[in-house]
Amino acid sequence: MKKNFEVFDFKEEDELAESAAGKLLEKFTNPSPCNSPVLQRQRIQSFCNEKRVEEEEMEGPSCAEPATAVESDDHQCEDDSTLVTEAKESRTILTFGLETTDHLEETDAEHVNQGLMLGLKTEDLAKETDIDHDNHGLMFGLNSEDDIEETDVDHRVESFSCQLGGNSFYAETSSYSQRQLNSPFSDSSSSEEQIDMMSAIDESLSDRSALSEASDSEDDEEDWMTEHCFNDEEKIDLSTAVIMTSEYVILKDMHCAASLVIFSCNGIKIKSFLANNEEVPFSCEFGVEDIVSIQYNWYQNVGLIILRIRVLLKDENCHEDMEELKIAVKEHNWPNKQQKINSLHVKYPAVWNTDLEDDVEVSGYNLNQQKRYFPSFDEPFEDVVYPKGDPDAVSICKRDVELLQPETFVNDTIIDFYINYLKNQIQTEEKHRFHFFNSFFFRKLADLDKDPSSIADGKAAFLRVRKWTRKVDMFGKDYIFVPVNYNLHWSLIVICHPGEVANRTDLDLDDSKKVPCILHMDSIKGSHAGLKNLVQTYLCEEWKERHKETSDDISSRFMNLRFVSLELPQQENSFDCGLFLLHYLELFLAEAPLNFSPFKIYNASNFLYLNWFPPAEASLKRTLIQKLIFELLENRSREVSNEQNQSCESPVAVNDDMGIEVLSERCSPLIDCNGDMTQTQDDQGIEMTLLERSSMRHIQAANDSGMVLRDLFDSGSNNTGSLLEQLQQPFEDPSSFYHLSNDSSAREQVDMETGEQFMCLNAGEGNFQCITETTSPRASNSFSSWNLGIPLVQKEDETDLLSETSNSSNDSIGIIEDNPIENTHEEEIDESPPRETVSLKSATVGSNTADHTTENEEPVSTHIELVVPSSQNDRDEEKPLEHDLEIGDKTSEDVGDDCDQKEPMEEEDEKRAAKRPRLSSPTGEAEEMEK
């Protein structure tokens, strides 16, 4: 069958279209001043002004008044028939060259002697009549994008329908537009109707032109709007108000299209046009006192303002409630408008840009129930380490948190922080299925810091990160997540079931539940092209590293591993790519099946589809991460506060616990209840409070009921260094709280339970450092001590030994027992062991020191205190220590009173001299025995 190609032949009719197209294209070149629309409009005005009559002499309705544009059908038909008859007599035809998507056929020149063409041009082509037929064409450039049906010239059907777009003059009603366009012209000398029509068109054009975007006069616009939207009683003073034309107004469930928005000193008034074909025009008014806040979004490129005004409304019961009034206004010069509005009343600048996150209460009712969370970090910010104790922990500083502000790029610290957070949310039994790389892995893999062009070299890329995965079973994981930061953009790589590549063939993979593949999730699709080869090569090299004998078949499978670029929700701005990465990852962890296959992704669940989630949901992650960091800060503050409270509180007495405190005698033997110490250069001593019961277990007792302190000292070790050597081993026991320091200088430590500070000294050191302060009074700590059970009767050899040691020095050592002699046996069998105090003190202290006796409120419990002083020249370790032993009873006193009263030990001893059983004489008595 022969095809007909005549439709492709070039005809003479096409020449007209080509010529019309050429003329249209000429208008897009440098404009000629003689053909400007302004000059054409001036020609029309001059033509009409010559034959214009006074408006008072006109009869019939005026087309220039839109309020009276809607007339009865009888008058309209009568006017139309009269005008058509006159047009036939004058053989004048009004042709409107209306351009639509189709080309208009040329008007038959034989039937037209004079033609007036009003061309409402758009982007399509219009054919003009041949000027050889002496047609006088007059064109109005009234650029419209809508379609108008052309008049049937042959049958003289004068029916038009016009729908004017946004770029043409405004016409609220179809009747007004139809009345304006359905009026043909007669000859200029035939009748007054032509003059009326031209006058009406001219007035209408001048009125409507003020509302178009090309209008140069703002005052004309306001005059026109106030004239057609308000009656005489509602006229407003333009000098004290700001008027704007809205695209739409929304208040609760009420919607209104074109209307006026008036800001005045009294408030805000909204009124729709009178000709909106509504029974009751939309109107509302709010006083200045009813305005709660005003916020706006200015889209400067299109000149659109979205106003969100929160106002107070009263219901039928006169209860106030807050509603949002949303207004869209087209305004290119918004800053000037805003300045004028603020000058109307002092309330406007006060409520402008009010933070809507603050709760607003009206009559005791919280109007903002759904308060969005935006934490403030104005206070000093302490770095957050998360997760604490993890080798991959992330440290977040204040600068990182500031990047969570709107319209800001998030950095790698925020990305890694939230990935660690998601990783910790996974169940413990499920963690082995996932592996998460941090944001630095891809940077190291692609070597972006040195040579970004090497991103295609997979072998070299693997060698750079080989240590990262040496201890990770990469091919035993179900999912491996790789955050990608490349070319200032974030995306996510998910490697699914990589171990299945070597275990299954391509034929098996189609029917397999686990299909190995690489998923690329990109919020700006196409921006990270070129990652396919890098990831495939890396996996191949990783497999070869773990399997030395790898066949070429398996290598080819890795190199041909499926790389799927998913169609996912896309970001709507240029700075939320990192948030989309995190949201992709979070939703994938929540919805990913145990066995994944890209061939079995169903649209029913929206999983990994374009409608997976709304884009705004990912953008809101800024607030979520801010809240999460703020909660971590609060938890850390509570922990620190609890530690401080525990350090200030007295610990609970436990029978097996003791405190240890090693002090320098250089800081003096005088210690008050607040931990302050007075220094003396001559007298030195050591005060020790035992920590653990196990610390004294190595001490051997002289008999079954007690302990002898001479076992602490060797015959050849009489200095303080050897004493510390004896005590060092029990301190290093794991059960003790602190160990002695091996540093050259003393180190201060704090007991976390009691809050006290301790000084640990090296063994053998004679120069002790003083503790400047203690966090809590030493005497306030009530420790349960070990019942030493010191015997009341001393053996002869022990007495001799003690006498010998007392002769070698002027120092004296006293052991004072709190228990009376008659109650000794009763206390030994008591269930609660008594608390005792052992004092080793220097005789050289004399009256320069005030040794205190500690008393407890409990009658059965006593306190043990060891004071080991040295001689004045204890810096010289070769000088021996001379001790004397004194054993006696004492009663307990309140520690607080002891600190305040500071009674010396000598007065206590004199009062209780009769009650003390002397097992060894004091210093003076020892000297008499020697004599």
UniProtKB/Swiss-Prot annotation:
Keywords: Hydrolase, Protease, Thiol protease, Ubl conjugation pathway. Residues 215-224 have a biased composition (Acidic residues). Disulfide bonds: none annotated. GO terms for biological process: protein desumoylation; proteolysis. PROSITE patterns: ULP_PROTEASE. Residues 839-851 have a biased composition (Polar residues). Its EC number is 3.4.22.-. InterPro entries: Papain-like_cys_pep_sf, Peptidase_C48_C. It is an enzyme of class 3 (hydrolase). Residues 873-904 have a biased composition (Basic and acidic residues). Protease that catalyzes two essential functions in the SUMO pathway: processing of full-length SUMOs to their mature forms and deconjugation of SUMO from targeted proteins. This is Probable ubiquitin-like-specific protease 2B.
